[in-house]
Amino acid sequence: MKTFLLAVCLMASSLSSHADQENTTLVRRYDGKMVPVPVLGSAEAQLITPRKHPDNFQGVKTRAIDPNTRYTPHTGKPHILVILANFKDVKFKVKEPKEAFNDFFNAPGAISDRGNGNNENYGSVSQYFKATSRGVFEPVFDIYGPIDLPNDMTYYGGKKANNRDDERPQDLVRDAINQVKTMVTNIDRLDSNNDGYIDCVYVVYAGLGQNNGGGATSVWACTSVINDASLKIGNKNIYNFSIGAELFPSLIRHRANAQDHTMQINSIGVTCHEFSHAMGLPDIYPLTSSAYLNNQEMEFWDLMDGGEYAGNGGFIPMPYTAWEKKQMNWPVNIQLLTTESSMTMEQTANDGGVVYKITNPNDKDEYFLLENIIQTDWYKGASNKGLLVYKVWDYDKVNMGDYPNNTPGKPRIAVVPADGLCMSSYKIQRHESTEPNYKELNKQEQRKYLEQLKGDIFPGTSNVKKLNFDANIPNFWWYSQGDINEKTTLNANYYKVNQALDNISISEDGKVTFKYIADYKRSTGIHSPTVNAQEDHRIFTLDGRYLGTNTEKLHKGIYIINHKKIVVK
């Protein structure tokens, strides 16, 4: 699970069980401290930063071990069982919970506000998937509860603030199913492919999630499986499940007065992300600390990365990328660029617009995808509009536990950033409370991260109109040799891409145009890598990490500055 303004916090929380089991008067701040609940959209709310995963998380490659893993069907209108679950000591705070979460999951149009900021969500979970699949997948969620679990929150959530080894998500799901199994009607429709298994069980548990504002005893949102032949609903077995929290760590935006402590219902982004795991998609962010690098992932441009928190905290999550649509076999118009020509992109992939592809001539599984991002409909949460270019090093049998970006400096799916830096959320600087004015400094760091995202796409905030090997942009290279046997300046391990883009522009209404160059080296003539290269004084390490422009802070070593190797002694 990725984060909004994200940083994995390493500080342990030593708060009382009472505070953690939240009367929801306190939420977990980025530094691990429990603080009063802020108002949605306030400056203080920016300091409540969700976490990607517990510090001790070790993924399991479920399908690599079991090739017959049953993923949730992703076509048609399968019925998904949703259980609203109270803990023994923490109850639902959302008004009209069954109706509110029916809207959350199933509303066909605008969501009505039932008193908990319900209409902050741009649409329902079902609407999201209908839009991003172009109508091929429109799940229907059957809502039951709230039911009462037999144990306190601590039993399921444990007491550790920074890892999940003391949590019991399977027990939570098992107990929820045992409470609801005699209530469920039309059991057969919960098994759309008639394989004897309920397609998926989604449990919404009361209160906050530890991944986003909850204390040490709260539960992490997650997706996993249960292997228990005795656990059934009717004659149907249970396997796939996802769980997520009831509440978002903020008070509603429009309060009656300062004494109004009405909590905000959760955003749909985490639910869309976790449910996508149940359908087989992996996390796109790295899960190993050695890969917590800039230019290593997709950040806010992908639901399976930070995009689950797009739209001010996940209220307008990013649609699937073209790569993800392709994995699901959903309609996506991907066209290979081969001949030099001028191209126009008028629509997003969600609207059926073309997605262009540039492929390594010697490796069909290595390519770049070009998508038009227009800040309309489900793309309203995007950081900017323009041409999104991302590198893909594809592989067979994509699975939930693959972690494609865990190899440092060699991501399988990562942004090609127009401004030379797709900043990792792991790299956001955190000022400690011992520093003067630390709160304001941290807000500035978070704003800086969000502002930097705007430069990832073309032309972006830096007005970058070209993409070629002279531009020395990270991730614009081949891992294996393409049609020229020359290594890149930024990273001597990888090869130059001989294809290029020129005259990239975007109109006010979001239309992207560019010229595709099939043989950049021939079109520019024989030249050294520095010919026509812009001197921008950007500093990179030899493995392509961007370090800014201040040479005074450099340690001893070799760096790339203005496309040349510079030795600092």
Regions picked out by a protein language model, each given a short descriptive name:
Residues M1-L5, K569:
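Positively charged n-region of N-terminal signal peptides that target proteins for export
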Residues T3-F4, S16-S242, D351-R522:
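Zymogen propeptides/activation segments of proteases
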Residues A7-S13:
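Bacterial N-terminal signal peptides
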Residues H79-I80, S267, K556:
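Alpha/beta-hydrolase fold active-site loops
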Residues C200-Y202, A206-N384, V392-Y395:
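Extracellular hydrolytic enzyme modules, especially secreted metalloproteases
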Residues H277, Q499, G557:
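Exposed beta-strand face motif in extracellular beta-rich ectodomains
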Residues S523-K569:
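C-terminal outer-membrane/trafficking sorting elements
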